Amino acid sequence: MISRNIYKLAAVLMVLVTAFTVTGLSGCKSRTMSNEVTTEYDTPDDYNDERSGVTYGNVDEISYYSPTTGSERKACVYLPRDYDESQSYPVVYLLHGMSGSYSEYSRIGALYVAQNAVDDYNRNPVIMVSFTVFTDADGGQESDYDFSELTAKYDACEHDVINALIPYINEHYSTKTGRENTAIAGYSLGGRESLFLCFAHPDVFGYVGAFAPVGGVVDTGSGERVYGNRGFLLSELVKDGEEQPLITLIVTGDSDPYCKESAINYSDYMTSHGINHIFYIRLGAHEVSVWNNGLYNFIRIIF
């Protein structure tokens, strides 16, 4: 039987298709790609597989204290192959979408995707960290809230990430620090939060990947805050002369019924406001194949 959460997810995501429409941007195109399917960012057939004869790193399950929730929270730390504490590594923080958890990226094979990208393009090895984005000090579940309340609980991860998780990771693992060594990426609602966190904290994050991101970070022209009790707009976060991300990558599936338009609108908004970014559309719906494609291409161009 399909759970009520699946029906809820479909319903609220359908709202995004009609609610997130940026005004005054007709005719805008992405800086790098048109709003058509491209093969430029295609991946090898085995890009998300555990390849035969290839050694992969380990995944640590850790627990850290969160002042935001007043409790211990779990996270997964994905270590690169041959992790050596005498060396230091850049870090990528990974954010899941609605109904996900700290172990979601382990389930969808992020360890293999990242190592394969590093091997295929001779990139620097990275540490990745995934955590539960839903942050509720009251100990509630996602199903307890309507969508506006739910997104506010996702927004609350900001304080958890900045004040608790990142300090814990830097203390317990051999990491490189600074924006030039710290990235953030996510899919769906996690993509929305990744965009916000990167633009809100340019001193912390230098790279952002948004894979089929939910809308709500740019001005819809309605004068209202779109999602979440706090609300935020890129127009308030990006100021003339302030640092932009070193790399911003946005991808969506050509048949995504929920977030294709919001991804295009993000790209159009960034183009019209002079924010450098990579945007492309690939074959697929709102699904893992699109998100993992985004992660693979993100890993191969950062650091």
Regions found by a protein language model. Give the residues of each.
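Non-catalytic cap/lid and distal C-terminal segments of serine-dependent acyl enzymes
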Residues: K29-F303
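Gram-positive cell-envelope targeting signals
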Residues: M1-V37
